[in-house]
């Protein structure tokens, strides 16, 4: 992203969460294209959309679902603005379940914006946004906070499995 920002003719903003950056997707990265998301793994029925620092948690969920026999699509949402309209159009009709993962609060985040766009596109998928609650977040390490608010890979996986179980 830094190389993209240096070469982009216009303003660019980064969000740097506290802690070290994950390199979990480093070996499968594609060049950054302005306003475009990155499809890490193609899949069917379930789309997992990860924003920023949630990549490592989302990959953990993806791997657990894969071991259960679900071939989910894993998408790295590189840009919040502009949104990847082609990706939104594609997932609007191609999936039964769409899950977003972001380390922000629910209100006004990527998941809320995406849900609005999906609704406008007539999407009939079950959409669930995973984010922190719209409340004061207590102090703690990133790991402590993710676990406390159910945003760690294990908790996210269990929530999704419950949703899938209830839909079958």
Language-model segments: which ranges?
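Thiamine diphosphate
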Residues: 6-168
């Amino acid at each position: 992203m830094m190389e993209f920002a240096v070469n982009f003719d216009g303003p660019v903003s980064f969000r740097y969460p506290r802690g070290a950056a994950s390199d979990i997707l480093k070996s499968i990265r594609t060049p950054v294209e302005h306003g475009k998301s990155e499809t890490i793994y193609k899949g069917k029925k379930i789309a997992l959309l990860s924003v920023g620092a949630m990549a490592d948690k989302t990959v953990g969920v993806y791997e657990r679902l894969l071991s259960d026999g679900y071939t989910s699509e894993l998408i790295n949402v590189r840009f919040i603005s502009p949104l990847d309209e082609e990706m939104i159009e594609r997932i609007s009709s191609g999936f039964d379940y769409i899950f977003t993962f972001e380390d922000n609060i629910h209100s006004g985040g990527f998941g809320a914006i995406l849900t609005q766009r999906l609704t406008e596109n007539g999407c009939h998928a079950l959409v669930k946004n995973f984010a922190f609650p719209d409340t004061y977040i207590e102090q703690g390490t990133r790991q402590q906070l993710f676990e406390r608010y159910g945003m760690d890979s294990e908790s996210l996986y269990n929530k999704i499995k419950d949703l899938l179980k209830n839909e079958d």
